[in-house]
Amino acid sequence: MTDSIPHIPVLVKESLSLFRGRNPVVFCDVTVGAGGHAEAFLTEFPSIERYDGSDRDLSALALSENRLLPFKDRVRLRHASFEEVDTLTSDGTYDGVLADLGVSSMQLNNLERGFSFQGEDHPLDMRMDTSRGMTASEVLNSLREEEIGEIFRNYGEEPLWRSAAAAVVHFRKKKKILTVKDLKDATSGVFPSYRLRKKIHPLTLIFQALRIYVNQEGAQLKVLLDSAFRWLRPGGRLAVISFCSLDDRPVKWAFREAEARGLGKILTKKVIMPSYEETRMNPRSRSAKLRCFEKSFEDK
């Protein structure tokens, strides 16, 4: 399977509604991906003269470049992490910033990337940026049992983190964990029968934990939340879409702290979630949450 399988952007209408009446001129999309949100924003807002889109996934950027060809004079794409975007961005640059956190449908559907437990014979990679960093396989084969357990606990909130880590280390003594099937085999005796009967795959939390660790998503999110308020012009808005509590909680707390410091106000007192119609059409959208913060019009 290839990256040509389209990613369906979530909460598009709701994201657009947060910027209507603002006439943004300079916009930043730090997770441009395949360009779904970008296409919608550039179509909806002719006022946007410059749309800076960045992503760590080179294959996604290639798709985005093709998708956004009709807007090529208004788009600037960059291969960059949140940290690298920060080094390239001056304070007070943007009227709006959008972040769509987590893994995309396109990445999940490409079994060769190792994000999904469906591709049994494919390598456990899980890197969003395949040009650098450790793969999930390298993590599982090189870290100590205690370190692996901490990953499963802290980034996956897996209740059986100790047992899962012990099973991984026991398995790798006989055979390296190189593929999705290897990880399944390594943890086959960990989960009780009731976990196996659930609709949610028992390895879901472990896959989440490995993905977050491999891509340093927590550290990257901290950089974003420490920096994005500075990137905004007075009256600018930061919109963040998250898909799990590990991402949503820091966003919620950062917005509350920024409001308490007088940096602006939270526009989404009640978090925005997908409609029933959207979750029916795109089941992967069901856990999405959208929050938005508006920077004060006065310098603080």
Curated annotation (Swiss-Prot):
This is Ribosomal RNA small subunit methyltransferase H. It catalyses: cytidine(1402) in 16S rRNA + S-adenosyl-L-methionine = N(4)-methylcytidine(1402) in 16S rRNA + S-adenosyl-L-homocysteine + H(+). GO terms for molecular function: rRNA (cytosine-N4-)-methyltransferase activity. Specifically methylates the N4 position of cytidine in position 1402 (C1402) of 16S rRNA. S-adenosyl-L-methionine binds at G35, G36, H37, D55, F82, D100, Q107. Keywords: Cytoplasm, Methyltransferase, rRNA processing, S-adenosyl-L-methionine, Transferase. It is an enzyme of class 2 (transferase). Belongs to the methyltransferase superfamily. RsmH family. It is found in: Cytoplasm. GO terms for biological process: rRNA base methylation. Coiled coil: none annotated. One of its GO terms (cellular component) is cytoplasm. It comes from the Bacteria. Its EC number is 2.1.1.199. Its main location: cytoplasm.
